[in-house]
């Protein structure tokens, strides 16, 4: 009978907390809670109770030196103001990387450092600026994960983490771990 109360002649379960409520109001959890986005390791209030459970990462395919004043990507939208090292990574809008993140609006992490997206996000690939990052072809690029929360992307897109997560295409390989 845990979680069940008799109200009049009917039984009811009391539940008033979503993920944020679980974190903020432990005394108001009553009979059960609705973890929601917390199942994906996302905390709406940036608390240390919930830990990240997902990472989206890829590897650097190619790195090229590009002179200042040159352009990168479709429609020449990536205009370089300085000589740059530009890396291509195999993820694009067909994989769920939103095109609005391109043109310097967001970044991924390469060896723990911010690598801004350069030019438009293409269908299968995008370019990142690794000029100030010690890296090589084959190194990882973290789109979101422990050190780059998915909320950084959702905030840049003026949306919610659910939309970012559900936009990841089925063509992206999933690897599941169990402790």
Identify what each model region corresponds to:
Residues 1-13:
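Single conserved hydrophobic/aromatic residue that forms the stacking wall/gate
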Residues 14-16, 31-35, 87:
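Hydrophobic faces of well-ordered beta-strands that scaffold small-molecule active sites
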Residues 18, 36, 60, 112, ...:
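Conserved, mostly hydrophobic/aromatic
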Residues 19-28:
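Catalytic cores of alpha/beta
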Residues 20, 38, 94:
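Catalytic metal-binding/acid-base residues of hydrolase active sites
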Residues 35-46:
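Glycine-rich phosphate-binding active-site loops on the catalytic face of alpha/beta enzymes
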Residues 50-59:
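Short coil-to-beta-strand transition motifs
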Residues 65-179:
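C-terminal accessory subdomain/extension
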């Amino acid at each position: 009978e845990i979680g069940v109360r008799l109200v009049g002649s009917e039984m009811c379960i009391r539940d008033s907390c979503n993920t944020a409520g679980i974190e903020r109001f432990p005394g108001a959890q009553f009979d059960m809670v609705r973890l929601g986005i917390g199942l994906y390791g996302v905390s709406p209030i940036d608390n240390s109770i919930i830990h990240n459970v997902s990472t989206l990462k890829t590897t650097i395919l190619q790195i090229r030196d590009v002179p200042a004043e040159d352009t990168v990507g479709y429609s020449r939208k990536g205009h370089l103001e300085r000589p740059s090292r530009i890396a291509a990574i195999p993820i694009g809008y067909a994989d769920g990387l939103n095109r609005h993140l391109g043109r310097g609006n967001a970044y991924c992490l390469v060896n723990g450092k911010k690598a801004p997206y350069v030019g438009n996000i293409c269908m299968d690939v995008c370019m990142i600026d690794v000029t100030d990052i010690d890296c090589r072809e084959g190194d990882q690029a973290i789109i979101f994960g422990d050190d780059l929360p998915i909320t950084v992307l959702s905030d840049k897109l003026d949306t919610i983490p659910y939309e970012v997560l559900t936009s990841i295409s089925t063509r992206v390989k999933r690897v599941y771990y169990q402790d």
